[in-house]
């Protein structure tokens, strides 16, 4: 989950001035597909943005933490049941968290780590057990982090990368579920926050963009679990942060949207593809609207297409077979930022929360249907 508390609070002050010029600019070349539609769902119990949403093994979705516009930070947790289409409160976390991460472990439990609690970044972590609906503290990270990434490796361990404390961090660490401890691993070549991390078929992890506050990078690097080290791997066409990345069926990675560091004034409509064989990036066409703050609002469908569900009123899908974007039937009430999109067991997608162009968090949810 990537959301910088400092950046979020500052940007809320200027949303009303710039949002109309930066959000919802349509590009007619994008067509509409009748294969998919989006419909309203029952609301969450609490308005949230910057929360996490994790599909657990029994098919429910764990919604954890987040915040409201007024600076209310949550330790509360909800569970969405596809069987009933409803949200119900679960046991709360031990700490209030926004900009944290949630990772489904191989044992079916969920690792919640870091984030911001309103007074600064956190190093604490806890594990949620769906069988008992309870959180248990686990070892602390070696560094306080918010706006970082956490990636489940093939070994079952979790790679934690970058993020922000007082500045962007280059450090990384690995969580071992067997010991419940975090251990340091090699550093990145650059400090990064608001970046993306994508597990590739090779087992390596692709890190793209991010950077320090309002200073995004175009560079990318690969983490090799075998050596515990990072190495540079090409550069994107443009510097991006607050963007999204998703693995494509062919093993390449799709990089979507983001901003040039000016936030609302600098949103991108463009996309790029990382070629895992050539270690290079190439442009991949434009979305229907410029979108940013969408890191958790992207999901790969069972068809292999990529759903982009944040940053605009309309959802769209990217078809790797044709290399094109298509709008989805139906729309949300407004563009939403720092929302979540979670692929459900039946192939539908739960879209939840986020804040609007006035910075107001929502409890509304939608279901993307195939």
Spell out what each predicted region is.
Residues 21-370:
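Kelch-like beta-propeller repeat domains
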Residues 1-9:
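Bacterial N-terminal signal peptides that target proteins for export
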Residues 10-18:
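Bacterial N-terminal signal peptides
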């Amino acid at each position: 989950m990537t959301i910088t508390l400092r950046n979020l609070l500052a940007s809320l002050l200027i949303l009303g001035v710039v949002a109309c010029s930066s959000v919802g600019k349509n590009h007619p070349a994008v067509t509409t597909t009748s294969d998919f539609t989006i419909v309203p769902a029952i609301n969450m119990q609490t308005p949230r943005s910057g929360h996490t949403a994790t599909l657990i093994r029994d098919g429910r979705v764990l919604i954890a933490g987040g915040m409201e516009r007024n600076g209310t930070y949550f330790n509360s947790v909800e569970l969405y049941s596809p069987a009933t289409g409803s949200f119900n409160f679960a046991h709360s976390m031990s700490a209030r968290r926004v900009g944290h991460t949630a990772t489904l472990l191989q044992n079916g439990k969920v690792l919640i780590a870091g984030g911001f609690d309103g007074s600064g970044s956190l190093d604490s972590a806890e594990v949620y057990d769906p069988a008992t609906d309870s959180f248990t503290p686990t070892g602390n990270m070696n560094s306080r982090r918010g706006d970082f990434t956490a990636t489940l490796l093939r070994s079952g361990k979790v790679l934690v990368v970058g993020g922000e404390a007082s500045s962007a961090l280059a450090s990384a660490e690995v969580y071992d579920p067997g010991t419940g401890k975090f251990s340091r691993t090699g550093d990145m070549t650059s400090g990064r926050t608001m970046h993306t991390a994508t597990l590739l078929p090779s087992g390596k992890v692709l890190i793209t963009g991010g950077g320090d506050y309002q200073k995004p990078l175009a560079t990318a690097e690969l983490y090799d679990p075998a050596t515990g080290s990072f190495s540079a791997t090409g550069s994107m066409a443009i510097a991006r942060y607050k963007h999204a990345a998703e693995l494509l069926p062919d093993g390449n990675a799709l990089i979507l949207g983001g901003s040039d560091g000016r936030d609302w004034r600098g949103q991108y409509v463009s996309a790029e593809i990382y070629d895992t064989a050539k270690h290079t990036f190439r442009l991949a066409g434009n979305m229907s609207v410029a979108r940013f703050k969408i890191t958790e609002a992207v999901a790969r469908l069972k068809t292999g297409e990529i759903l982009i569900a944040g940053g605009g009123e309309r959802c769209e899908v990217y078809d790797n077979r044709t290399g094109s974007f298509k709008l989805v039937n139906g729309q949300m009430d407004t563009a939403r930022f720092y929302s979540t999109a979670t692929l459900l067991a039946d192939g539908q997608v739960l879209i939840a929360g986020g804040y609007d162009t006035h910075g107001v968090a929502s409890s509304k949810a939608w279901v993307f249907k195939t």
